[in-house]
Regions:
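Mixed-charge (Asp/Glu-Lys/Arg
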Residues: 1-58, 63-151
Length: 151
C-alpha cells in the first residue's frame, strides 16, 4: 500500500513556500473535496476507491479495493497541528474491525514521534503534508493546487 513514497517518518524535509501555500489550500478546501482528491490518487494508481461519506469525524474516510483484491482503509486529516498516537490507535482498531489488510492516514500536518512509533510494525502507512504533496506531483504530474483558485 505504500503508494506515496517517503524516505522514512523521522526527519521531515524542509517545506518551501510554494508547498506551504499548497498545504494551506488543502487545509482550507471542503472535507469532501480533500477526500475526493485522495480517492482520485488511488484510482489513478489502478485501485478502486470510494469515500465513506457521512458527517463528523470517523475512524476512516475511504475504502479501497486494491488491484490485488485486498481491502484497505484510509483516514484523512486536514489539520494544522500534529496527528497524535490516539488517532493511530483508533485507526488501527478500525482496521481490525473492518478486516483491512492495509491502512493509511494522510494528513496536511505532521505526525508526533509517538504516533509514528505506534504505526511501526503494523500495516499502517503515515503520509504527512509534504509526502502527500509529493504524491500529488508524482501521480498527477502537477502540484494540483498551484493556482489561486482550487475549486
Amino acid at each position: 500500500m505504500s503508494v506515496f513514497k517517503r524516505n522514512g517518518h523521522d526527519e521531515a524535509p524542509p517545506i518551501d513556500p510554494a508547498a506551504t501555500k499548497a498545504i494551506n489550500r488543502l487545509i482550507e478546501m471542503p472535507r469532501a473535496e480533500f477526500e475526493q482528491l485522495v480517492v482520485d490518487l488511488y484510482c489513478a494508481l489502478g485501485h478502486t476507491a470510494r469515500r465513506t461519506g457521512g458527517l463528523g469525524d470517523r475512524d476512516f474516510d475511504i475504502v479501497i479495493v486494491a488491484k490485488t483484491g485486498q481491502h484497505w482503509i484510509v483516514q484523512c486529516k486536514q489539520w494544522r497541528g500534529a496527528v497524535g498516537e490516539s488517532v493511530v490507535r483508533e485507526f488501527y482498531a478500525a482496521m481490525l474491525r473492518e478486516h483491512a489488510t492495509q491502512g493509511a492516514i494522510i494528513t496536511t500536518a505532521r505526525f508526533t514521534p509517538k504516533a509514528a512509533q505506534l504505526a511501526q510494525g503494523k500495516s499502517i502507512h503515515l503520509y504527512d503534508g509534504p509526502a502527500f504533496l509529493q504524491a500529488l506531483q508524482r501521480i498527477k504530474g502537477t502540484l494540483v493546487l498551484d493556482t489561486d483558485e482550487h475549486g
